[in-house]
């Protein structure tokens, strides 16, 4: 079984979605069940509704799952596993207070050395601290694993100490709950971000202590860097939020296409998730950081907009009139996002705001003169744009840019865009909606 294990503590990050997509693809390729595990044991950081938001995003991306579990439902199992380790003398109670440990951390910092917990501290405050934590005994050997992307990764004994499994309130730590659940659900491969590399030896040690002889294969994905700063994209970067990208009018198909493409060797530029299942391979992923490029994502989104079928295009743009499909297709050629497309069609159909767009009083006057001339014309009477244009120029007594710029604004709501002869048939059939001024 493969799994995706998000925490409901904020907006879904593009790095997390990338991991979800890759786990889903490999599960399909290997014909294995796919598990979604909501890691909600950190009650203080959980945000109400974020779990549902995550699941909704996965559905939008075309990702389905065979099983959905909430990690908090397994807390009795986690405690049972901790008790097993205590009985087998593989774990121990630690009575050292948070204040004591903080002092030791500060001392290590001042001495410019890494902080490592010492087992001798476990009983120092036993008389005054009656709520101990449970720690796994530190290993006396190195822990190594062969990462599917990073190759061999090794942690020496002095890099690992006796770490906490259960907190004072008997709630499991992230690493303990994660390791226990991966055993419980027989997870065979974990694809996740490289920020989890330091967690991996701890989870391996927990699973070995619990008697696992069937090691999990790990693949740690390189981080995604911001295109401008070159730094890791954090939650503060709005483009790192999948929700933000969707709200900006990027299609789920395009986002998935992009996240599969970056840092990868792909056989074609534009593809669907189902197509990627046919050829995706972890071996083709680079071990170097991927660079986020919003401009390229916009290009891919433009290509996916063109691939939308008629019904989906009408649904996404909220247009009920099928006669406008051709116009939508013309507008798509100039749009990178669904938001831009919706804005163009809205400007076309809504009353025109010449007060907002006029450059000076003379320009406003020309707009009003041309508007009155157009109102007197029967749009359906002209066989083409050329004959319509000549009559409009005659009636308004305007020519050149004094004619064309006001004309474009009055007919499309925009000062530039698709050539007017191409959209004139749609202007003819919708002229009563098109030729209106905002009060």
Curated annotation (Swiss-Prot):
Complex formation: Monomer.
UniProt-listed Enzyme Commission number(s): 6.1.1.-
Catalysed reaction equations from the record: tRNA(Glu) + L-glutamate + ATP = L-glutamyl-tRNA(Gln) + AMP + diphosphate
Name of the top EC class for this enzyme: ligase
Organism: Helicobacter pylori (strain J99 / ATCC 700824)
GO terms under biological process: glutamyl-tRNA aminoacylation
Protein name, UniProt field: GlutamylGlutaminyl-tRNA synthetase
Encoding gene per record: gltX2
Function field: Aminoacylates tRNA(Gln) with glutamate. Does not aminoacylate tRNA(Glu).
